[in-house]
Amino acid sequence: MLNKLIESLKNAPIIMKGDYPYFIHPLTDGVPELDPDIVREAVSGIIRIADLDVDKIVTIEAMGIPVATALSLAVNIPIVVVRKRSYGFPNEIVVDQQTGYSKGKLYINGIDKGDEVIVVDDVISTGGTALATLKALEKAGAIVKDFVTVIEKGDGAEKLRKMGYKIKSLVKIEVSKDGVKIVDHLR
């Protein structure tokens, strides 16, 4: 079911950013090119495991957008994109976000109190962006019914689960300088 996604992850090139092994994949980086079959597999997997009885799909700029858009088209639920720049709308939610390798602000528009949402993203690593987004959505009065990431690496998802968040993933990986190892995946 996730054959192309898994194979593409196993073949993903690794670059070193200092001492940090970083995998390059079309779904997480947009390069080299994003195979529509991989997006279809991801969306099919999300549909199988997600609670889609929601008002809106929330995704995080930039690489959550392709999967969330395809999901939106498949299930006819609108998307809210958490952006990296402000638009200055009156009810804009500003999110302070920090990951293992960057920090900055994120901006959420289009969320109303009582909205039931699912958060969909490409990858969760440290969990910093996910946690900041989840807390901001809760503060805005949204009801987060589910969080699904295509790829889980590192310990961020597990930390969030221990905090009581329901985090689901399609593929769990470990990354080393030698490559990507598939630890677990949706069957």
Curated annotation (Swiss-Prot):
EC number(s) given by UniProt: 2.4.2.8
Catalysed reactions listed for this entry: IMP + diphosphate = hypoxanthine + 5-phospho-alpha-D-ribose 1-diphosphate; GMP + diphosphate = guanine + 5-phospho-alpha-D-ribose 1-diphosphate
UniProt main location, coarse: cytoplasm
Positions of transmembrane segments: none
PROSITE patterns given in the database record: PUR_PYR_PR_TRANSFER
Protein's cellular compartments: Cytoplasm
One annotated GO molecular function: hypoxanthine phosphoribosyltransferase activity
Keywords: Cytoplasm, Glycosyltransferase, Purine salvage, Transferase
GO process terms (BP): IMP salvage; purine ribonucleoside salvage
GO cellular component: cytoplasm
Broad class of enzyme this protein falls into: transferase
Entry keyword annotation includes Cytoplasm: yes
Cited Pfam families: Pribosyltran (PF00156)
Source organism, top-level taxon: Archaea
Gene3D superfamilies assigned: 3.40.50.2020
Pathway info: Purine metabolism; IMP biosynthesis via salvage pathway; IMP from hypoxanthine: step 1/1
Protein family: Belongs to the purine/pyrimidine phosphoribosyltransferase family. Archaeal HPRT subfamily.
HAMAP family in alphabetical order: Hypx_phosphoribosyltr
Described purpose of this protein according to its UniProt entry: Catalyzes a salvage reaction resulting in the formation of IMP that is energically less costly than de novo synthesis.
Record text on subunit structure and interactions: Homodimer.
Name listed for the protein in its UniProt record: Hypoxanthine/guanine phosphoribosyltransferase
Source species: Ferroglobus placidus (strain DSM 10642 / AEDII12DO)
